[in-house]
Curated annotation (Swiss-Prot):
PANTHER family: 30S RIBOSOMAL PROTEIN S18, SMALL RIBOSOMAL SUBUNIT PROTEIN BS18M. GO terms for biological process: translation. This is Small ribosomal subunit protein bS18c. It is found in: Plastid, Chloroplast.
Length: 101
């Protein structure tokens, strides 16, 4: 058979199946902070099901647990550290002192 007539065959690459993020022994509970924190972004947002690789039922339970933890103030609603950072800025009184001299 001529090279140009041969059907194109994809090379079979082996791939490792990722472990599920929630094992059968894990309890989805609002008090289980080590489990819940894996499904929250750095900003404090709940990650999507596609990113988490969860089933629909697991994602629903995780979402409810995160919301309960937020209401009970175990988790912050927003995780925005930039808001609390202090930058060196001139205060109003420092500007007045310079003007008075």
């Amino acid at each position: 058979m001529d090279k140009s007539k041969r059907p194109f065959l994809k090379s079979k690459r082996s791939f490792r199946r990722r472990l599920p993020p929630i094992q059968s022994g894990d309890r989805i509970d609002y008090r289980n902070m080590s489990l819940i924190s894996r499904f929250i972004s750095e900003q404090g947002k709940i990650l999507s099901r596609r990113v988490n690789r969860l089933t629909l039922k697991q994602q629903r339970l995780i979402t409810i647990a995160i919301k309960q933890a937020r209401i009970l103030s175990l988790l912050p609603f927003l995780n925005n550290e930039k808001q609390f950072e202090r930058t060196e800025s001139t205060t109003r009184t420092a500007g007045l002192r310079a003007r008075n001299k």
